[in-house]
Swiss-Prot record:
Involved in hyphal formation, virulence, morphogenesis. Belongs to the small GTPase superfamily. Rho family. CDC42 subfamily. The modification Cysteine methyl ester is found at C188. A motif (Effector region) lies at residues 32-40. Keywords: Cell cycle, Cell division, Cell membrane, GTP-binding, Lipoprotein, Membrane, Methylation, Nucleotide-binding, Prenylation, Virulence. It comes from Candida albicans (strain SC5314 / ATCC MYA-2876). This is Cell division control protein 42 homolog. Its main location: membrane.
Length: 191
C-alpha cells in the first residue's frame, strides 16, 4: 500500500492538532495541548486503491524551529495553516512558513489552510479584533495569498464543525499524487 506523507505546519494555537484529531477521529478535542511532534495514519481509498495517509503534526512555537525540520524529509505534501481569526498567523504564512518549507523541501506541493472558520463571525472575536483595528481573514485574502505564493490551493475548514475538513485532506492527497507542474515565468530574462 502506497503511503502519502503530509506534514502540517503553522503558528502555535492555530488549530493544527485539532484539525488532525477531528479528521482522524471525527471528534473535536476538548483541551489545548501544545505539540512537539505527533503523527497519525489513516487509510483512504482512491478509486479502488487503498493509500495510507501519514499525517505529521508539528509544533509552531519558535522554541521548536530547529527541531521541526527533522520531520520534513520525504514529505509528499505540506499543509501550511493559519487561523482566519489571527491576522498575525496569516502574515506568518508568507514571512515564516513558506520560506521554511521551500528551504528544506523545494518543489514539494503546498496547500494553504485557513482554520477556525467557525469563529469568523463570533461576536467576542470580532470585538477583540476590532479593538486592535483588525478583522478576520477572508476567503478572498487566502486565495490571493495562495496565488501570490504559488501554492497548489487555498482551502478553509472548521475542525469544530468539520465543515471543509474532508476537502483539506482530499486536496492534500490529490496534490501529493499529482504534483503541479511549476510554470516558468513568461518574463523575459536579459543575460
Amino acid at each position: 500500500m502506497q503511503t502519502i506523507k503530509c506534514v502540517v505546519v503553522g503558528d502555535g494555537a492555530v488549530g493544527k492538532t485539532c484539525l488532525l484529531i477531528s479528521y482522524t477521529t471525527s471528534k473535536f478535542p476538548a483541551d489545548y495541548v501544545p505539540t512537539v511532534f505527533d503523527n497519525y495514519a489513516v487509510t483512504v481509498m482512491i478509486g479502488d486503491e487503498p493509500f495510507t495517509l501519514g499525517l505529521f503534526d508539528t509544533a509552531g512555537q519558535e522554541d521548536y524551529d530547529r527541531l521541526r525540520p527533522l520531520s520534513y524529509p520525504s514529505t509528499d505534501v505540506f499543509l501550511v495553516c493559519f487561523s482566519v481569526i489571527s491576522p498575525a498567523s496569516f502574515e506568518n504564512v508568507k514571512e515564516k512558513w513558506f520560506p521554511e518549507v521551500h528551504h528544506h523541501c523545494p518543489g514539494v506541493p503546498i496547500i494553504i489552510v485557513g482554520t477556525q472558520t467557525d469563529l469568523r463571525n463570533d461576536d467576542v472575536i470580532l470585538q477583540r479584533l476590532h479593538r486592535q483595528k483588525l478583522s478576520p481573514i477572508t476567503q478572498e485574502q487566502g486565495e490571493k495569498l495562495a496565488k501570490e505564493l504559488r501554492a497548489v490551493k487555498y482551502v478553509e475548514c472548521s475542525a469544530l464543525t468539520q465543515r471543509g475538513l474532508k476537502t483539506v485532506f482530499d486536496e492534500a492527497i490529490v496534490a501529493a499524487l499529482e504534483p503541479p507542474v511549476i510554470k516558468k515565468s513568461k518574463k523575459c530574462t536579459i543575460l
